[in-house]
């Protein structure tokens, strides 16, 4: 992510940047794991420990602020029971770290975690999966777009 940030931003004049990092950072991986993506929360090591996550977020925020855009951070969605490479509760810890960084910089947080904790099991691709079916993704998109509209102070669509 950090290596690609300048390329992704390019020289575009951004009005708003709504971003998230975290779900892949808190994942535990092990080269011998059988689960997709080498996920293994028992024998694996965390991709990006919380202290490094905080430093990375700080770097990202400082770079994004240089664009002059309004910045919105979307916190990490819920980690359900049974996820092969993620521990329930790590989502909360990483969101706390992110909230501190965003507060230091006056960046609003779009609370996608709170939204996804209300999702019934049928909105997830399968039990123990952090991914959503299209209807779940639609609900996320609705909240994201509402927050962006609010930040841009645009009139709401009827």
Label each residue range with its predicted role.
Residues 3-158:
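Alpha-helical cap/lid subdomain in secreted, periplasmic
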